[in-house]
């Protein structure tokens, strides 16, 4: 186009690129959030409860406000994420608004000058993805945006450092890893090759932290006190006392009570397994306390002697709950356990990838913090593959924030600028074009 005097008129410059990136690992239990820019990073994310909670006095807590709660008894939750996917945007927006856009927000940002990198779980429904994209651009107006698979972002961490063989550049995707993510809603197995997820081989187990907490609640309510209205307290108890058994049958034998009228010595002594858990009283003690097993406490309770403390003695409850990850059929779930899922996943990829995948198994998510989890998983996987296969299972130092740290590294990589979508592109091409671009995933050749 020419103006007066024949001079060419330059096309209007597009909007300036965003100066900072907000990385959100939007989990069902917690949001991991932090800012990343070219010259600095938050280092570690802020962990925010992803829920709306109401106490028995009908006071409402939104997101991080839950930290102010002192009485966790009969706490009721409303969560925007179910089965790993955002299904309640009304609740999710209320949490995001308070945490990132309110004037008093600890991590306040201007979306018009911010790029958003958001995690999602594998195999999300296209309708949920499109709704998410619309909220990001039309409701909030972020300058640019990328929505990627949470497990895959872990490929942008220095995964080999866990195995004591660090790679030279931590922001390049790992060559090949098998990522097991066991979180609040479910457990997924994702093979990753050079930053690309191998979609046909992704497997999912519908056992996560929520189901295990519910199972522990049921056991306690049948054997001890009615805990059906105490999800927060039971979840704390699960995280404090449960462990993954390395000898399930042996531990079960040690905690067996014995025949009627004759209690076994192992049962009476606790066999090194039984623990006492002192419940919070909401006055002087706001969180439960784990103690070594004291047989006298149980005896006094049976005799009806009044105590100032409510104490639960946990025996096989400590290990039968995490066992669901390996044997979900114990409670009637017709799905294979984690080790069998790994085998199913590898059967869906070329056998030439097996050595690399089996030698680089990385576990993340809160359930991987269970004592003995990695050792048990490695043992179970070894049973399912030939003896010549080398199996290594490792867990990052903090598996809960591992996905966020990987996404923060990705934000500085050239792949991010290539795969992101700007608000202008969204307005020009529409949601379907955005969905196709995001479906390409990570690790494309530049």
UniProtKB/Swiss-Prot annotation:
Location(s), subcellular: Cytoplasm; Cytoplasm, Cytoskeleton; Nucleus
GO cellular component: cytoplasm; cytoskeleton; Swr1 complex
Record-level GO BP terms: chromatin remodeling
Superkingdom of source: Eukaryota
One matching Pfam family: Actin
Keywords on record: Activator, Chromatin regulator, Cytoplasm, Cytoskeleton, Nucleus, Transcription, Transcription regulation
Region (Disordered): 1-24
Biased composition (Basic residues): 1-11
SUPFAM superfamilies linked: Actin-like ATPase domain
Subunit structure: Component of the SWR1 chromatin remodeling complex.
Role summary: Component of the SWR1 complex which mediates the ATP-dependent exchange of histone H2A for the H2A variant H2A.Z leading to transcriptional regulation of selected genes by chromatin remodeling. Involved in chromosome stability.
Family label: Belongs to the actin family. ARP6 subfamily.
The protein's name in its UniProt record: Actin-related protein 6
Organism: Neurospora crassa (strain ATCC 24698 / 74-OR23-1A / CBS 708.71 / DSM 1257 / FGSC 987)
């Amino acid at each position: 186009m020419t103006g007066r005097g024949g001079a060419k008129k330059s096309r209007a410059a597009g909007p300036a690129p965003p100066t900072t990136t907000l990385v959100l690992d939007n989990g069902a239990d917690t949001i991991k959030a932090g800012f990343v820019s070219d010259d600095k990073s938050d280092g570690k994310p802020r962990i925010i409860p992803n829920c709306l909670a109401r106490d028995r006095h009908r006071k409402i807590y939104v997101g991080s406000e839950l930290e102010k709660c002192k009485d966790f008894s009969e706490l009721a939750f409303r969560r925007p994420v179910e089965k790993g996917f955002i299904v309640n945007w009304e609740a999710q927006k209320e949490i995001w608004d308070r945490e990132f856009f309110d004037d008093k927000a600890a991590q306040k940002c201007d979306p018009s000058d911010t790029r958003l990198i958001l995690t999602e779980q594998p195999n999300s429904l296209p309708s949920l993805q499109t709704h998410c994209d619309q909220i990001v651009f039309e409701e909030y107006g972020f300058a640019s945006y990328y929505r990627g698979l949470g497990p895959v972002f872990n490929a942008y961490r220095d995964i080999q450092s866990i195995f004591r063989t660090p790679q030279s550049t931590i922001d390049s995707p790992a060559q090949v890893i098998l990522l097991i993510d066991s979180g609040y809603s479910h457990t997924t197995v994702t093979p990753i090759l050079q930053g690309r997820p191998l979609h046909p081989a992704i497997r999912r187990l519908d056992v996560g932290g929520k189901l295990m907490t519910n199972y522990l609640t049921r056991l306690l309510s049948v054997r001890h006190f009615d805990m059906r209205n105490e999800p927060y307290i039971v979840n704390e108890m699960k995280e404090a006392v449960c462990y993954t058994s390395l000898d399930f049958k042996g531990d079960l034998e040690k905690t067996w009570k014995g025949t009627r009228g004759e209690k076994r010595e192992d049962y009476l002594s606790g066999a090194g397994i039984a623990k006492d858990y002192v419940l919070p009283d909401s006055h002087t003690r706001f969180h439960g306390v784990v103690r070594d097993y004291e047989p006298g406490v149980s005896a006094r309770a049976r005799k009806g002697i009044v105590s100032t403390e409510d104490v639960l003695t946990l025996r096989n409850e400590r290990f039968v709950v995490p066992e669901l990850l390996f044997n979900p059929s114990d409670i009637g779930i017709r799905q294979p356990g984690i080790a069998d899922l790994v085998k199913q996943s590898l059967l869906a990829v070329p056998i030439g990838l097996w050595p690399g995948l089996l030698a680089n198994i990385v576990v993340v998510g809160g359930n991987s913090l269970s004592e003995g989890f990695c050792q048990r998983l490695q043992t179970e996987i070894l049973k399912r593959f030939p003896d010549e296969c080398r199996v290594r299972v490792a867990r990052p130092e903090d598996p809960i924030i591992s996905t966020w740290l990987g996404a923060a590294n990705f934000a500085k990589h050239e792949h991010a600028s290539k795969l992101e979508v700007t608000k202008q592109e969204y307005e020009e091409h529409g949601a379907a074009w955005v969905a196709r671009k995001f479906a390409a995933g990570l690790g494309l050749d530049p």
